[in-house]
Design a protein with these regions (language model features):
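Strand-loop-strand
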Residues: 1-177
Length: 177
């Protein structure tokens, strides 16, 4: 079995309730042959909102030595019908809104999403935070600049955020970097 599929769209609404809504313009190609699926192309995220009231399921991954069994005690093997190879550029407009865990703001940037068969997903690129607010411990901070950079495995980004707050009756600005 072989297939070569192109998928192009403009301003498509995508949602993953209750946390994520997006408007995207995908330009993707999928090639299927034997036991391989290769996905490449570009996805433009025109608008979006991510709400993180609580950490999503899977935020804390299981140890590699965990074995999952069924009711009879037999190991459940997660067989995939295809070895998946991914090479997709994701361009996120800075109108993407994020809310949760004390943060409200926007982010945007470009990420290259790559994955080889049976390997972890990798991200390369950076997201900028053009504006935002962070509230914790009765303190309200304005995010004046921020960058989330990825250079490999997706769960290990480099985060650089500068947040400040003005003390109203004084000419003082305090913050964290």
């Amino acid at each position: 079995f072989k297939a070569d599929i192109n998928f192009d769209g403009e301003s498509l609404q995508f949602s993953l309730p209750p946390d994520l809504t997006l408007i995207v313009s995908p330009h993707l190609n999928a090639k299927i042959k034997a036991s391989e699926l290769k996905v490449s192309g570009r996805i433009e995220v025109l608008e979006g909102k991510l709400s993180l009231d609580k950490l999503p399921q899977g935020s804390v991954s299981l140890s590699k030595d965990v074995i999952i069994v069924n009711d009879e005690g037999e190991q459940i093997v997660n067989d995939k019908p295809f070895d998946i190879f991914t090479n997709v550029r994701v361009v996120i407009a800075d109108t993407f809104n994020v809310e949760g865990q004390g943060f409200i703001g926007r982010l945007g940037g470009e990420l290259q999403v790559s994955q080889q068969a049976n390997q972890p997903l990798q991200l390369f690129g950076s997201l900028k935070i053009p504006e935002g607010r962070y509230s914790a411990y009765s303190q309200n901070l304005s995010v004046t600049k921020g960058t989330i950079s990825f250079n490999g495995i997706a769960n290990n980004p480099y985060i650089s955020i500068q947040a400040t707050r003005s003390i109203e009756d004084e000419n003082i600005i305090v913050g964290i970097d």
